[in-house]
Curated annotation (Swiss-Prot):
Protein name: A-type ATP synthase subunit E
Gene name in the database record: atpE
Chief subcellular location: membrane
Alphabetized SUPFAM superfamilies for the sequence: F1F0 ATP synthase subunit B, membrane domain, V-type ATPase subunit E-like
Protein's organism: Methanothermobacter thermautotrophicus (strain ATCC 29096 / DSM 1053 / JCM 10044 / NBRC 100330 / Delta H) (Methanobacterium thermoautotrophicum)
UniProt keyword list: ATP synthesis, Cell membrane, Hydrogen ion transport, Ion transport, Membrane, Transport
Gene3D superfamilies found in the cross-reference section: ATP synthase, E subunit, C-terminal, F1F0 ATP synthase subunit B, membrane domain
Amino acid sequence: MSSGAEKIVSSIMSEAQAKADAIIREAEDEAAGIVDEGEKRARMASERILESARKQADMRYQQIISEAKMNARRAELEAREEVIQEAFKKAEEELKNLASTSQEEYVSALRGMIKEAAVEIGGGDLVVSMREDDRSLDLGLDKIAAEVEAETGKKTTLKVGDSIRTIGGAVVRTEDGLIEVNNTIEARMSRFRKALRSEVARVLFE
C-alpha cells in the first residue's frame, strides 16, 4: 500500500475511533444518568414508604393511647358508681334500721312525710297507707290534718288505710284514689337520687 493510501486509511480509522469513543462516552453518560435517576427515585420511594409507615405508627400510637385513657376513665367511673351505689345501699339500710329501732325519731319523720304528702295533694279527705308495723302507731293524724288544713285552706281528714310493703314512710291518696303521693322512704330515695348522687359524689371524692 502506498504511503498516500496508508494516510487515508489511518485518517479514516482515527476518525472512526474518535466517533466510537464519543458514542461510548455518550452512552456511559446516559447510563450514569439513568442510574442516578433510578437511585433518586428509589430514595424518594423509600422516603415515602418510611413517611407513610411513620404516620401509620403515630396514628396507631394515638389510637392506643386514646383507648387506654378511655378504658381508664370507664374503669374510674365504674368504680365511682360502685362506691356511690354502696353508699346508697348503706343509707337505705340505716333508714330501715331507724324505722325499726329509733321509735321516737322515726315517728317524728313519718308524721312529717304524711303531712308533706297531704299538703302536696291539697288537703281534703285522705287515706294514709303504711307498713303493717306503723298502722298501730300513735301518729296524731287529727293534729296533722289540722296542720294540713291550716296550710291548704281546705277541710282535711286523715284515716289509716290498708298496709303496704315498704321499709318506712307512707302513701297518701284521696278517698276516690284519683290523686296519690308516694312518700315512702324508697320513693323519696328514688326521687332525690339524682340530687343525692351529686352530693354523695362530692362528699366521697372531693
